[in-house]
From Swiss-Prot:
Belongs to the beta-2-microglobulin family. Heterodimer of an alpha chain and a beta chain. Beta-2-microglobulin is the beta-chain of major histocompatibility complex class I molecules. The keyword Cell inner membrane does not apply. GO terms for cellular component: extracellular region; MHC class I protein complex. Residues 1-20 form the signal peptide. Its main location: secreted. Residues 25-114 form the Ig-like C1-type domain. PANTHER family: BETA-2-MICROGLOBULIN, MHC CLASS II-RELATED. Keywords: Disulfide bond, Immunity, Immunoglobulin domain, MHC I, Secreted, Signal. Component of the class I major histocompatibility complex (MHC). Involved in the presentation of peptide antigens to the immune system. This is Beta-2-microglobulin.
């Protein structure tokens, strides 16, 4: 009986420690297909390795929020950090600038990662 209580107590302590871990998100912005001006494509913002799970992700066109953005389900990795994919259909042009803005408790201000079309 004492062993069961001790095991249960250790599990509770472990779970409490998981909530104390904070990791900032890693952000990658890329397209599904090689970009061509005037040709429809998908813009992706992959956010990973963050904890706790609450996060805000926005895709931006010329600094303004894109309204029609889809999100994958929140998932977690083996190390209990989380990852999420935000994506939208878009048609790139030579003049438009695209970015992903991420807000998370570990960041003092939102992290903005610009899409580099030559990568």
């Amino acid at each position: 009986m004492a062993r069961t209580v001790a095991t249960f107590f250790l599990m509770l302590v472990s779970l409490a420690c998981l909530d104390a871990i904070e990791r900032p998100p890693q952000v990658q912005v890329y397209t599904r297909h090689p970009p061509e001006n005037g040709k429809t494509n998908f813009l992706n913002c992959y956010v990973s390795q963050f904890h706790p799970p609450h996060i805000e992700i926005e895709l931006l066109k010329n600094g303004k929020k894109i309204e029609k953005v889809e999100m994958s389900d929140l998932s977690f990795s083996k190390d209990w950090t989380f990852y999420l994919l935000a994506h939208t259909e878009f048609t790139p042009t030579a003049n438009d600038k695209y970015a992903c803005r991420v807000s998370h408790v570990t960041l003092k201000e939102p992290k903005v990662v610009t899409w580099e079309r030559d990568m």
